[in-house]
Amino acid sequence: MQYPKNYDVVVIGGGHAGTEAALAAARMGAQTLLLTHNIETLGQMSCNPAIGGIGKSHLVREIDALGGAMALATDKSGIQFRVLNSRKGAAVRATRAQADRILYKAAIRHTLENQPNLDIFQQAADDILVENGRATAVVTATGIIFNTQTVVLTSGTFLGGVIHIGLESSKGGRAGDQPSIKLADRLRELKLPVGRLKTGTPARIDARSVDFSVMAVQPGDTPLPVMSYMGDVSMHPEQVNCYITHTNARTHDIIRENLDRSPMFSGKIEGVGPRYCPSIEDKIHRFADKDSHQIFIEPEGLTTHELYPNGISTSLPFDVQLEFIHSMKGLENAHITRPGYAIEYDYFDPQNLKPTLETKSIDRLYFAGQINGTTGYEEAGVQGLLAGTNAALVTCENSEFDVWTPRRDEAYLGVLVDDLITHGTTEPYRMFTSRAEYRLLLREDNADQRLTETGRKLGLVDDVRWQAYEEKMEAIASETSRLKDIWATPINALGAQVTAQTGEVLSKESTAYDLLKRPQIHFNDIAAITGSEVDSQVGEQIEISVKYAGYIDRQQEDIDQMKRLENTALPMDFDYSVVSGLSNEIVQKLAQVRPSTLAQAGRISGVTPAAIQLLAMTVKKQKKVQAALNAS
């Protein structure tokens, strides 16, 4: 049957990509439907119960700066918060939160159910209707047809999903959930470039069977950090400890002796697994010289005894899992509540995507999350937000944007998308700060300053968040001005206080603002002396902007040069074979990737600076010819 209501955007999948996609589209005013196989699993954390980490928290903050749900849901569910790399530079500092699975899922569902313009419907999607090269409707398992202007597909690990435990395998999207077989077959019919990837999860353990007394305690940070710019410590539930144990020689022997029973090593699994989150059997094989690996014992929530042993993801048979877990200190009597497993699933070459995450071959069909070859909640969430935003823009008549994708110098989201569509991936892609060439400008602390104004123009940022952002920016400007008006000299009282509190002896007069350039002097020192009571986020921004000013200016110069290439568009139907001087190899690579700008073309492996110059001259010449034709 035809559903009586027509939608602007239909989002398939209620995971981290799907929820952010649906929320973004609805916030922008698009009539949106979130289609999920099970309403009870909306926002479910399928693997580790944690949000954030190196590179990942930067993505979470970007989602938050654009009005998304992930960061606030984390503040409402986080049972341990830590700042990683806290002693390193501002660019690589990262917040990580251990989350209560039940509370996180509840926070996401509450946000979804209270979002205007958003409907939720429980049913698996079996088909996407395509007419004249454009997605027009979604068909459910029972034949309900939802007509729509755009479709966002966020299928996670469900497309053709196969679960492996030892040499036994079964069809599944994750443990306890059916896979999407018909939809996977339909996408293959559409001749989209498909591959197989693999991920996995460890066994879960009953905390009552664990001896924590022999493990190292890993407490959270004090004072507690928050994940969202709108978050507050008062939102946090009860805080708990995590624990650390280790594998040992006996653990490794057990695993090595049973590698022939591993689907990964027997050849049963064809999909490539995540390089930066390998299974324990892969670790033992790849790092044979190591006699021990850290294992983090993480609570799954406040109302459950289940623990997540981070670091022992596995697809080995259950009897082997039991044996190697019992070989570790503190886990000798551990009761396993759920076995670990690997899951193999379809993904589609992201080089077939536009920067908006719309497929090149089918108009108005967008992909986000693991279907694009990424791994991680955060990577999925930020893609969902981008896909949902661009899907909604198709239906918006009054927006100043036709499409929107941030550049590499604007957001880690820009880095992620550019990496995917330019280089593709043959293994699950994970974000790291090292992937960003402008990471000093792309810190987790300034995501709001980079993106919230754009989010407001797009319609993603509501009045409450916008007011908070404006107040923060006014506070930064006001406090900066105040500090520039306060002078410390070697002989005045302020200078003496600075020396007494920090040990820094002044040799000449200096403003309180300029004092922050000194490595040993921090904003909190100056605030204590001068009586400032501004928010800690404001102080942090001022201190970073002062201490890193020289480096930031140099990166900005590099960005200004790159922008000239970013602003030179390459048409999707550009004929590279007519560019005199390009080698056949470069022509083939450019024709395959179809870069949208000269800058993206320059990031394709094998495309030389000389080739970019030839392209630039050809584009310039074509523009002149076109301008002359238009004038005649």
From Swiss-Prot:
Molecular function terms from GO: flavin adenine dinucleotide binding
Binding-site positions, NAD(+): 273-287
Pfam families in the cross-refs: GIDA (PF01134), GIDA_C_1st (PF21680), SAM_GIDA_C (PF13932)
GO cellular component: a single term: cytosol
GO terms of biological process kind: tRNA methylation; tRNA wobble uridine modification
Residue sites binding FAD per the record: 13-18
Cofactor(s) needed for function: FAD
Domain of life, source organism: Bacteria
Oligomer and partners: Homodimer. Heterotetramer of two MnmE and two MnmG subunits.
Function: NAD-binding protein involved in the addition of a carboxymethylaminomethyl (cmnm) group at the wobble position (U34) of certain tRNAs, forming tRNA-cmnm(5)s(2)U34.
Family, per entry: Belongs to the MnmG family.
Name listed for the protein in its UniProt record: tRNA uridine 5-carboxymethylaminomethyl modification enzyme MnmG
Species, as recorded: Psychrobacter arcticus (strain DSM 17307 / VKM B-2377 / 273-4)
Source organism phylogeny: Bacteria, Pseudomonadati, Pseudomonadota, Gammaproteobacteria, Moraxellales
Encoding gene, per UniProt annotation: mnmG
